[in-house]
Curated annotation (Swiss-Prot):
Protein name in UniProt: Hylin-a1
GO BP: defense response to bacterium; defense response to fungus; killing of cells of another organism
UniProt KW Nucleotide-binding keyword: no
Keyword list, A-Z: Amidation, Amphibian defense peptide, Antibiotic, Antimicrobial, Cytolysis, Fungicide, Hemolysis, Secreted
Cellular component terms per the entry's GO annotation: extracellular region
The protein's role, per its UniProt record: Has antibacterial activity against the Gram-positive bacteria S.aureus ATCC 25926 (MIC=8 uM), E.faecalis ATCC 29212 (MIC=16 uM), and B.subtilis ATCC 19659 (MIC=8 uM). Has a less potent antibacterial activity against the Gram-negative bacteria E.coli ATCC 25922 (MIC=32 uM), and P.aeruginosa ATCC 27853 (MIC=64 uM). Has antifungal activity against C.albicans ATCC 90028 (MIC=16.7 uM), C.krusei ATCC 6258 (MIC=16.7 uM), C.parapsilosis ATCC 22019 (MIC=67 uM), and C.neoformans ATCC 90012 (MIC=33.5 uM). Has hemolytic activity against human erythrocytes (HC50=18 uM).
Subcellular location, record wording: Secreted
Lysine amide PTM sites in chain numbering: 18
Tissue: Expressed by the skin glands.
Length: 18
């Protein structure tokens, strides 16, 4: 489960940083 949430959270963070 975490394996799927990790990339999702990373993508959201990258979007915020961008």
């Amino acid at each position: 489960i975490f394996g799927a949430i990790l990339p999702l959270a990373l993508g959201a963070l990258k979007n915020l940083i961008k």
